Each structure stands twice: as structure tokens, then as C-alpha cells.
């Protein structure tokens, strides 16, 4: 046996000089056309962290699955109960919540924002959110039409998720996929990545490696 785990006098073991593991990032996409950038987002994070990905049924219309990093598993609603056979078997949305250090939804559609704010959990993604441990960081990067972004419901929903402790990576103003010009475009994958990584590393420094 390798000598990296000496036995204490009390019989307990303790790893010594073990290499720190990579951060575990759970990336999720909901049904916005900005999900065309999801594979790029996964590539950004996979160079730094262990990544698992979740997609809603609507987001699959836009995600190029062939462009996803080969080492990133993409979970869909079909996976939620496919491995569950009997009481005691693992439940995917619970296991993903346990696994992740940080969750990031990018893009966050108006529909999924409304579901989260209302506590709904009718797919894999929203079940993870409903079961999330809010002592762990959670980021969202909304993407929607300018009029949807400016809708009074959106303001109410953003207040609700802020009260949960979810951090907002705000949308940007540009020409949108629908042709309109205005605020509502998802932040660039590089911006989302740098925001989350800076947060993680600053917290790790403050807490000697723990976030």
C-alpha cells in the first residue's frame, strides 16, 4: 500500500500531501437560443474543472452535442429515472447536487427563471435547483428578448432567486437573435467562466481551499 495515508494512533487514516482535486462544476442550459454557446461554455470550464452538464428538452434544439467536450457527460430529462429500479437506488438530481461544488445555469431562459422563482420542479434541471444546497455557490446567466427582460415578472423573479442566494451574471446589450437590439443577450462564455473561477479562487484563498 502507498504510504500516503499513515495510520494515526487512534486507528484513523489521514491523507498527506494529496493533490487537491479540481473544482466540480455543474453546468446547465435551458431553452434559449443562447444555448448554441453551451458547448463553448463547457470547453471553457473543462480546462480548469471537472464538469458535468444538464440540458432541458428545449435547450437540446440549440446545443451541438457533437461539439461538447468528450469528457463531459450531458444529462437530459431521459436520464433522470432511467437508472432507478427500486427503493434505495440513487436518484440523479440528488447525486448531481451532492457532486457539484458550484452550479451555473447559462443560458437561463425566462421560462426556467419563472419556474425556479416559483419553486417548480418538473424536469431534471429544476429538480436539481429545488434540491440544491444553498450554502454552495450558484450562478445564473439569463438570456431572453429585451421586452421579456424588462417585463415586471422578470424583476419579481430575480428578487426571488436573489433571496435564495443565487448570483446573477447580468445579460448584455447587443443585437439579439430575434433581430432586436437591446439588453437580454447572455454574457459571453469567457465572461461567465472568469466570473465563476475568480469567485471560486478568492473563496478558496479565504478558506484555505474550501468554498
UniProtKB/Swiss-Prot annotation:
Q: Which GO terms describe its biological process?
A: coenzyme A biosynthetic process; photoperiodism, flowering; positive regulation of response to salt stress; response to abscisic acid; response to cold; response to lithium ion; response to salt; response to sorbitol
> Per its Swiss-Prot or TrEMBL entry, what cofactor is needed?
FMN
User: This protein's superkingdom?
Assistant: Eukaryota
The EC class name is lyase
Q: At what residues does the UniProt record annotate the site feature described as Important for catalytic activity?
A: 178
Query: Pathway, per UniProt?
Result: Cofactor biosynthesis; coenzyme A biosynthesis; CoA from (R)-pantothenate: step 3/5
Task: Copy out the induction comment.
Answer: Induced by salt (NaCl), lithium chloride (LiCl), sorbitol, cold and abscisic acid (ABA).
Describe its assembly: Homotrimer. Interacts with CYP2 in the plasma membrane and nucleus.
- What this chain does, per the record? Involved in plant growth, and promotes salt (e.g. NaCl and LiCl) and osmotic tolerance, probably via coenzyme A (CoA) and endogenous proline accumulation. Catalyzes the decarboxylation of 4'-phosphopantothenoylcysteine to 4'-phosphopantetheine, a key step in coenzyme A biosynthesis. Favors seed germination and helps the onset of flowering. Required for roots development.
Q: Know the name of this protein?
A: Phosphopantothenoylcysteine decarboxylase HAL3a
Amino acid at each position: 500500500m502507498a504510504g500516503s495515508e499513515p495510520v494515526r494512533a487512534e486507528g484513523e487514516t489521514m491523507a498527506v500531501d494529496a493533490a487537491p482535486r479540481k473544482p466540480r462544476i455543474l453546468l446547465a442550459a435551458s431553452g434559449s437560443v443562447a444555448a448554441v454557446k453551451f458547448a463553448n461554455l463547457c470547453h471553457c470550464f473543462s480546462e480548469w474543472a471537472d464538469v458535468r452538464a444538464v440540458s432541458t428538452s428545449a435547450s437540446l434544439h440549440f446545443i451541438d452535442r457533437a461539439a461538447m467536450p468528450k469528457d463531459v457527460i450531458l444529462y437530459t430529462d431521459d436520464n433522470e429515472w432511467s437508472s432507478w429500479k427500486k427503493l434505495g437506488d440513487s436518484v440523479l438530481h440528488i447525486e448531481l447536487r451532492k457532486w457539484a461544488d458550484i452550479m451555473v445555469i447559462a443560458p437561463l431562459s425566462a421560462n426556467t427563471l419563472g419556474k425556479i422563482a416559483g419553486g417548480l420542479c418538473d424536469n431534471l434541471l429544476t429538480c436539481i435547483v429545488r434540491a440544491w444546497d444553498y450554502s454552495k455557490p450558484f450562478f445564473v446567466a439569463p438570456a431572453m428578448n429585451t421586452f421579456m427582460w424588462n417585463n415586471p415578472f422578470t424583476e419579481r423573479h430575480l428578487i426571488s432567486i436573489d433571496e435564495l442566494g443565487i448570483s446573477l451574471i447580468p445579460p448584455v446589450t447587443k443585437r439579439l437573435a430575434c433581430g432586436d437590439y437591446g439588453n437580454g443577450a447572455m454574457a459571453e462564455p469567457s465572461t461567465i467562466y472568469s466570473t465563476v473561477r475568480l469567485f471560486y479562487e478568492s473563496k478558496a484563498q479565504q478558506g484555505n481551499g474550501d468554498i
